[in-house]
Amino acid sequence: MSNTPYNSSVPSIASMTQSSVSRSPNMHTATTPGANTSSNSPPLHMSSDSSKIKRKRNRIPLSCTICRKRKVKCDKLRPHCQQCTKTGVAHLCHYMEQTWAEEAEKELLKDNELKKLRERVKSLEKTLSKVHSSPSSNSLKSYNTPESSNLFMGSDEHTTLVNANTGSASSASHMHQQQQQQQQQEQQQDFSRSANANANSSSLSISNKYDNDELDLTKDFDLLHIKSNGTIHLGATHWLSIMKGDPYLKLLWGHIFAMREKLNEWYYQKNSYSKLKSSKCPINHAQAPPSAAAAATRKCPVDHSAFSSGMVAPKEETPLPRKCPVDHTMFSSGMIPPREDTSSQKRCPVDHTMYSAGMMPPKDETPSPFSTKAMIDHNKHTMNPPQSKCPVDHRNYMKDYPSDMANSSSNPASRCPIDHSSMKNTAALPASTHNTIPHHQPQSGSHARSHPAQNRKHDSYMTESEVLATLCEMLPPKRVIALFIEKFFKHLYPAIPILDEQNFKNHVNQMLSLSSMNPTVNNFGMSMPSSSTLENQPITQINLPKLSDSCNLGILIIILRLTWLSIPSNSCEVDLGEESGSFLVPNESSNMSASALTSMAKEESLLLKHETPVEALELCQKYLIKFDELSSISNNNVNLTTVQFAIFYNFYMKSASNDLTTLTNTNNTGMANPGHDSESHQILLSNITQMAFSCGLHRDPDNFPQLNATIPATSQDVSNNGSKKANPSTNPTLNNNMSAATTNSSSRSGSADSRSGSNPVNKKENQVSIERFKHTWRKIWYYIVSMDVNQSLSLGSPRLLRNLRDFSDTKLPSASRIDYVRDIKELIIVKNFTLFFQIDLCIIAVLNHILNVSLARSVRKFELDSLINLLKNLTYGTENVNDVVSSLINKGLLPTSEGGSVDSNNDEIYGLPKLPDILNHGQHNQNLYADGRNTSSSDIDKKLDLPHESTTRALFFSKHMTIRMLLYLLNYILFTHYEPMGSEDPGTNILAKEYAQEALNFAMDGYRNCMIFFNNIRNTNSLFDYMNVILSYPCLDIGHRSLQFIVCLILRAKCGPLTGMRESSIITNGTSSGFNSSVEDEDVKVKQESSDEMKKDDFMKDVNLDSGDSLAEILMSRMLLFQKLTKQLSKKYNYAIRMNKSTGFFVSLLDTPSKKSDSKSGGSSFMLGNWKHPKVSNMSGFLAGDKDQLQKCPVYQDALGFVSPTGANEGSAPMQGMSLQGSTARMGGTQLPPIRSYKPITYTSSNLRRMNETGEAEAKRRRFNDGYIDNNSNNDIPRGISPKPSNGLSSVQPLLSSFSMNQLNGGTIPTVPSLTNITSQMGALPSLDRITTNQINLPDPSRDEAFDNSIKQMTPMTSAFMNANTTIPSSTLNGNMNMNGAGTANTDTSVNGSALSTLTSPQGSDLASNSATQYKPDLEDFLMQNSNFNGLMINPSSLVEVVGGYNDPNNLGRNDAVDFLPVDNVEIDGLVDFYRADFPIWE
């Protein structure tokens, strides 16, 4: 290999400099041609030659790294040589920078910077002139006038002339006038053509018309999740933001939430009637509100003496457990009971008299006398020392008690009735111990966790030696650890490349003595075991001489755990049936030999046998690293190794979310997955960022010369036969803060010997070690920057590291002077850092316009269009990433302070490959997409085996998914902005449809990529080998986001036009509760035909919005396939459970109802207790929270938060809108903008035809008590049948169209609301109990003497609802009213400060002729009245399961249902203490 210093490709300045250096100082000796200067040199120069040898010039190779690695001749061409081009690795062609060429490089950088600044000035002036050219952004005439065009073009030409600095003022003015005249003619022609063109040909001009439209994203897509312990803000990029941004979803959720409340009221009436018939007290004692009389006496307001003698006592209905929470089987033969007064007997430590008759006294800490929490006398309980386990059976205790008690963290007694502080925990828990909630964990701090303690000691007081001994038992054998580490650096390291591989392996050798297994040592100092006899050699000792070694041990445990989880055999097996073949990608198994495949299979089978338990990480981070203290209150021991462990810990929690419940005590926030949406990750990332600032990572290490003065002992010396293993403390590591304080005397003496020049080889190695330390420094910093961008994108939260270049000058890892010839994979890592940072800059440009309040409040359409076009150029490969970043800067979309200036000398060859090329790597004749291109074949003379190539391509795949998800989000934002404007401005219809089609294309692209990933994770040697854990959640999250848009389009396709709020009725055409037989038969036939077509559907093709009637069926087939996928993934990943529930929720809700199939099983098929949906099980657990819990859900708040305040004009037309009395008054009069009526982009003539046919169908007669009742009859209406409104509207009224009180036959039908709803009106959120609709009829109280007598004994507040004698006129339907004890109406009064719905007495209706014994609520009739949503007939049976059942008091405190919406199961602390109180005991 020739390395001549004289190369024509080197710049002339550099060549001259090098030649002058090589010819001096002996230039005079070369005067005689052909003379041998070395042999004729006088002896005087011998000393000079010897001095040259001592200096040992650090010669930089001129050949590229790849050619030197392959040991072939390099032609040294820039930017890449011919050898690399032929081999197909031109993107990896890398030249080491020459030290003597730095000055010339700086001059070139200055020229490039000036050139870019000129281009940016031109672009900014052009953009500014465009903005000022159109003062009216919504007027096509003002924009297309010749004057505005002249201003635009004239300003543009003027800037060009000024920048060129050529020509005189007169010539410039002449040219300017000519250009104005030319532009006037062109603009007039364009204006005349646009006036006569059709909609398709004028799309460009229409787009220009709305370019300056402003969008306010701060209100349309921001959510606030009110939790039990605080609030969480969710920005526009969060997956829940679509729930607020889409009007159809908002109305649908409002319908579902209101329907759920009405269903609860129906169950309440049914239960009240059952109690009335069985002579039980009608008051729910567990949920009864306080009153003035009852609060003082703590007695039930109902006179029980008025009931018959056979009445069952109300205490039997109490939901509180009467079972002793103590596991009596815990009392061993030698145990001394804890109670002081029963020391000679084996008695239960709990006083059972406290549980007699269901009486649960309040705990000491609660000042309220009406608390439901139990009290145990902790002062009388002392634990015997031999007892090692709490005698309380935590399973029964935590399951039976209310959730607010179980989740209380202020007092340990609220979690367990035993005082654990008096226990002495010295013995170990048995292996068969059930999963208990440990009580030794601290309850403060972001990382105080509660998790099961399995197969390990009760670690309340474990010493360091005990922890190390336990870890030795948990860790795998030495040979297995070595294999795990090799697998990690081969497959997983590119995903988190913040370690120095060589240095980390050496530290593992020092801690675990792995080098003692085999004398053979590889190049990185890691022993490579080869003998099977040493396979089971266990870890007997762990050496941790320094604090940083504890962090390295923690990183090792994470690597062992994460690598084991990522083994392809551990991935979830997915079988999509016939569609599986559509999502397969070619693997590389065919390129491997049979012996290599066999060896790989043996290694994986060996690794599968040795799982590192997650408890090992808990012990290490709690007792050795003490990470809770480091991340919260102390930074004394923070160094680079600590930051690395924190990053690995964060990475592990996000990837291995199934272990999150073991490592964290994060409460169930109801999010899609607590491991990914939890705020604990935000806190941890902020701690990592602050620790990085503390270590100085935001400054480049070249700024600190003291790093060069502190020269560490080289890792190569340590690796040579382990000579320094006996005294590891004398070997400072690269991962420590390299300061004089951390370097002991022995290392400093060794460094002094090296600096003295006695060992030049060691000095050179030390310089390499310092450079590698700086390299690790830079990698850690830019990985933190990437983490910040990803978290902001996932949660919609502001970035922590904004305007990076204002406070950081850290260079990219590509600036490190490292020779990668021995470590090619590190070269790939370096290039990935540069590429991924440039992609992050593109993402930052989008996040700035969506999340930054200053920009998002008035972002313009043309800015979002520019972002869309640049991102499309990037993901489609039509523009290099460098050009995309430059365009963002030039257009003012990305400030240079974000880091754009760093990319001045980036490699233009190494870019983001096209997605088809990534998926079809090595397969030139196979395409997954219809528009995919075959990669051109190149002449490859010698294949270079690149390390972790498949992992790098998998990371490229994830970057494509992220970019295309942003494209979907931007198009969706513009679509939802312009779609409602179509009724007022028809020109926006074209824009809305274009954006909708683009959003659908990118949503389907994310859906396909999600399917491709999960369909190939188990394939051997596939693209996603060992990436199943790391990329599972990102891929599934993007697929879930895509399905949300599918739901939006299905609603539009099935519902038709949205007639809006406060303008007209939701249903424009009257519909009936029944179905026309001909229409139903046609629908069934069409559904069967569409299902047959779905079998032939190609899931890899895009979906066209013009598909017509089949659009809903096509999209529904995608949802069914995704539901099938998430159901299979739920066995492996916890976050897939919620996504499966979410998908099943909409599948069941939007499925086309079939009246015939429902009628076969009779009317009882709608009963919640006797029916389950065949497709989705346990659907009623979706919204398991009660009404107050739902009020804290951000989806609920935004679904019902846009209502208008009640006005006088709305009182005369209660059916035309919805209103919540008093809600806006409490909220200070603020409200979200109303939803306007408009036709969706999917609306066709077929929708109108079906709505008319359905509307003309006559209402079917329904069977009631073996007889038919005519709904149109004006006679007495039997029980259970809601009367038809007198205003001519159909009896089937959608719930949203009748939130205000409906007039029914001249009066209103009252409903006894749940008594718990009375006291929940003081919150700032609107409550559902004021939302009224067609109610189920009540029995006549006058026919039941017991009922009438009980009403007389009620408090005035309760009597207002149960014994009102005055019929309220229609003019006061929307007013605030209350009833006194006499039954008279008092206007302008309220209960607890909030208005209630107007109610009338049942005696005033036609129901008085029937007795209470004839009353039988009909659930089917009730559901059919509310199953119509904007023309979409929702399956009533599905509605029951979707909205959930009545919250039975006997089931209070259960927390087994998992909501896919963020619904908390406990109250928010401090918010309800002043107005919430219950009656747990009735005397």
UniProtKB/Swiss-Prot annotation:
Residues 1-56, 126-208, 432-458, 706-767 are annotated as: Disordered. Pfam families: Zn_clus. The keyword Oxidoreductase does not apply. The keyword Zinc applies. Zn(2+) 2 binds at residues 64, 81, 84, 93. GO terms for molecular function: DNA-binding transcription activator activity, RNA polymerase II-specific; RNA polymerase II cis-regulatory region sequence-specific DNA binding; zinc ion binding. Zn(2+) 1 binds at residues 64, 67, 74, 81. It is found in: Nucleus. Residues 1-50, 143-152, 160-176, 432-447, 706-734 have a biased composition (Polar residues). Residues 64-93 bind DNA. GO terms for cellular component: nucleus. Residues 130-142, 177-208, 735-759 have a biased composition (Low complexity). HRM repeats lie at residues 280-285, 299-304, 323-328, 347-352, 389-394, 415-420, 1192-1197. InterPro entries: bZIP_sf, Fungal_TF_Env_Response, Transcription_factor_dom_fun, Zn2-C6_fun-type_DNA-bd_sf, Zn2Cys6_DnaBD. Signal peptide: none annotated. One of its GO terms (biological process) is DNA-templated transcription. Residues 105-134 form a coiled coil. Keywords: Activator, Coiled coil, DNA-binding, Heme, Iron, Metal-binding, Nucleus, Repeat, Transcription, Transcription regulation, Zinc. Residues 244-444 are annotated as: Heme-responsive. Its main location: nucleus. Heme is an effector molecule for CYP1/HAP1. The repeat region (see FT table) mediates heme induction by masking the DNA-binding domain in the absence of inducer. Regulation of oxygen dependent gene expression. It modulates the expression of Iso-1 (CYP1) and Iso-2 (CYP3) cytochrome c. In response to heme, promotes transcription of genes encoding functions required for respiration, controlling oxidative damage and repression of anaerobic genes. Binds to the sequence 5'-CGGNNNTNNCGG-3'. Binds DNA as a homodimer. Interacts with SRO9 and YDJ1. In the absence of heme, binds to at least four cellular proteins, including YDJ1 and SRO9, forming a high-molecular-weight complex (HMC) which results in repression of its activity and dictates its DNA-binding specificity. This is Heme-responsive zinc finger transcription factor HAP1. It comes from Saccharomyces cerevisiae (strain Lalvin EC1118 / Prise de mousse). The gene is HAP1.
